Amino acid sequence: MSIYDDILKQFPTIDEWSDSDQKIMLEPYTYLGINTAKELPSMVTKALNHWYQVPQPALDIVLQIVGPIHAACLLIDDIQDDSDLRGGNPVAHKVYGVAQTINTATYVCFDAYHKISELRPFLKSPETIDLWSIINDEIAALHRGQWIDLYWRDSLICPTEEEYLRMIHNKTGAIFRLPMRLLQALSPVDSVPDCFPLVNIVGILVQIRNDLLSLSADFTKDKGFCEDFSEGKFSFPIIHSVKADSSNSLLMDILRLRPKDEATKMKALRYMKDQTKSLDHTFDVLCKLEKTAKQELEKLGGNSELSSIFERIHLSPTPEIEDH
């Protein structure tokens, strides 16, 4: 008998999905080799639970939501930035192709979405708390931030520092606000603290820290040498340098070229370091952000886990530039 003779019985509902199919489909995701539990969003989430006291089973589900979404964002970011390396290895889309990597990243996000329903039994008032609106709000914010970042890059429009901070508030802040808001909704504590200001400043701090690190020698082995220039990206220190001397078009000209050679990128980096002092400015801003974050932490009564995280991400004075 041909399969077509009994086609309706062959496919009565949604097709079954085997474990082997799932494993193959997730390969670009698993290739990242990211231990999501050791990534900053997950670490901050666990530290925030010091105040929210969400039961461990519910906390685990929240981590299973934020971890994969963060990893999926990295997969998409690498494609949109046309990156070559992540963690010192070729990026996933250079191994599996752009199409497969996009499909896997999207699937991982939807898989995380499904876990929202598993949190409903932990809600005190499931009829009044909409967990779906929380995840929808923050995923939308993330995409809005990513859009404006790409728009500036592709249109060669240098934003102001204030505009950049607002972009970070959406793009990076969403990854930290999402789990915090879920914990807030799930908390059995009668009076939970307002962690929004702290989490928002953490998102800004983390992004600007990454912007500065991406111009350091230590970052070269993970992502390549000064890849922000090759990507034409307006990072925080680059924005400061462009705005510091509008009469000098050197940096804008280099960003327009999106150079791959180290000599051109080193020329841009030395201009930022020696002429506009943009690396020093970025470090000074980081110090102010750290101070604000620690003050906010004190207002909330302190948190040893978050204090440890702040110590871990603290940067020493501006890293030295090494010749290449």
Curated annotation (Swiss-Prot):
One of its GO terms (biological process) is isoprenoid biosynthetic process. Mg(2+) 1 binds at residues 77, 81. Pfam families: polyprenyl_synt (PF00348). Its cofactor is Mg(2+). Binds 2 Mg(2+) ions per subunit. Its EC number is 4.2.3.-, 4.2.3.106, 4.2.3.46. Mg(2+) 2 binds at residues 77, 81. Gene3D superfamilies: Farnesyl Diphosphate Synthase. It catalyses: (2E)-geranyl diphosphate = (E)-beta-ocimene + diphosphate; (2E)-geranyl diphosphate + H2O = linalool + diphosphate; (2E,6E)-farnesyl diphosphate = (3E,6E)-alpha-farnesene + diphosphate; (2E,6E,10E)-geranylgeranyl diphosphate = (E,E,E)-alpha-springene + diphosphate. GO terms for molecular function: lyase activity; metal ion binding; prenyltransferase activity. Belongs to the FPP/GGPP synthase family. PANTHER family: GERANYLGERANYL PYROPHOSPHATE SYNTHASE. IDS-like terpene synthases originate from a geranylgeranyl diphosphate synthase (GGDPS) progenitor in fungi, after the split of Melampsora from other genera within the class of pucciniomycetes. They lack coupling activity and act as classical terpene synthases. Terpene synthase that shows monoterpene synthase activity and produces (E)-beta-ocimene as a major product and linalool as a minor product, using geranyl diphosphate (GPP) as substrate. Also shows sesquiterpene synthase activity as it is able to convert farnesyl diphosphate (FPP) into (E,E)-alpha-farnesene. Finally, TPS1 can convert geranylgeranyl diphosphate into (E,E,E)-alpha-springene. This is IDS-like terpene synthase 1.
